[in-house]
Amino acid sequence: MKEYNIVITGVGGQGILTAANLLGWAALKAGYKVRVGEVHGMSQRFGSVIAYVRFGDDVYGAMVPEGKADVILSFEPVEALRYINYLKKGGLVFTNARPIPPVQVSMGLATYPSLEEIKRIVEEEFNGKFLAFDAEKLAIEAGNVITTNVVLIGALTQTPGFPLSAEHVKEVIRLSVPPKAVDVNMKAFDLGVKAAKEMLNL
């Protein structure tokens, strides 16, 4: 496999960089060359954050070029739209459905797009696939809202063409989190897997 490119986005405090590092570590353990990159200086709470995970046999540079992302994994719907130009034609946008309206929306200076609008843009302009579910709700069900990132990673492992096996990624997460957090993270991962299987009719 030449390369597989993931763009992870959301707002500060959602665990985006942790998710990028977990996926990068899983790809490394699977024997791929890996590059993980992030945009610094914007990760204050509620500020826009973007991270890149690139892996394969032939990967150079940490930044995913525009139009080259196989997947945009978004922790917040409008953030997927903000970085939509990274998506390749026929790519996948997988997002947490729960919005965190930007300041401009809160102040009445902008309107927040519906999931239907975002889906239309992904499908019509990028010939892509759009999947959204309430990952935060499942993280709370698992036992801690902070595991939203792990719910999303679990879901990602079920998407068509994703090169890393769910069991492999799950094991890396198990080894990476503190011992007392293993159970809640494993449950979060499994709930993400289940949600994706239901959405994808697997």
Curated annotation (Swiss-Prot):
Pfam family, one: POR
Entry keyword Transport: no
Reactions the enzyme catalyzes: indole-3-pyruvate + 2 oxidized [2Fe-2S]-[ferredoxin] + CoA = (indol-3-yl)acetyl-CoA + 2 reduced [2Fe-2S]-[ferredoxin] + CO2 + H(+)
Segments forming a coiled coil: none
Entry's EC annotation: 1.2.7.8
SUPFAM superfamilies tied to this protein: Pyruvate-ferredoxin oxidoreductase, PFOR, domain III
GO molecular function, one term: indolepyruvate ferredoxin oxidoreductase activity
Top class in the EC scheme: oxidoreductase
Purpose: Catalyzes the ferredoxin-dependent oxidative decarboxylation of arylpyruvates.
NCBIfam families in the cross-refs: IOR_beta, PRK06853.1-6
Quaternary structure, from the entry: Heterodimer of the IorA and IorB subunits.
Name this protein carries in UniProt: Indolepyruvate oxidoreductase subunit IorB
Species whose genome carries this gene: Pyrococcus horikoshii (strain ATCC 700860 / DSM 12428 / JCM 9974 / NBRC 100139 / OT-3)
Gene field: iorB
